[in-house]
Amino acid sequence: MRKIISMAAAALILASGSALAGDAAQGQSLYNAKGCVGCHGMNGKSNNEQLYPSINGKGAGFVSAAIAAFKSGERSNPMMGPMAQTVTAAEAADIDAYLAGQ
C-alpha cells in the first residue's frame, strides 16, 4: 500500500511540474501577440531601460512571478496591471520559458 501511495505522490509531483513548465516556442508567439515586444523589446531586451525593463534571461519563474504579482495587485503599474490580467498562468509559463532562454 505504501508503494502505491508513494508512486501516486510521485506521479502527481511530476504531473504538476510539467504543468508549470512552459513551451518556449508558444511563449515566443504569445510574447509577440500579446504586445509584450512593444515595450520590452525583441527577445525581452528593452531599448529603453528607464521606462521598460529588459525581462530576458532572468531565469525560470521570473516572468511568471512578475505577471502573477501584477495580476494580484502585489505589484502595481498602470501599464502592466491591465496587461497582466489578459495573461493566463499557462500563457505566463510559456512566455517565461521563452524569455528565460534569451
Language-model regions: role of each:
Residues M1-L20:
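Classic N-terminal secretory signal peptides
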Residues A15-N32, S46-L51, A69:
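Electrostatic cytochrome c docking/interface patches
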Residues D23, G59, T88-E91:
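Acidic/polar helix N-cap motif
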Residues G35-M42, I95:
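The canonical Cys-X-X-Cys-His
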Residues N48-S54, A68-Q102:
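Axial heme c-ligation environment in periplasmic c-type cytochrome domains
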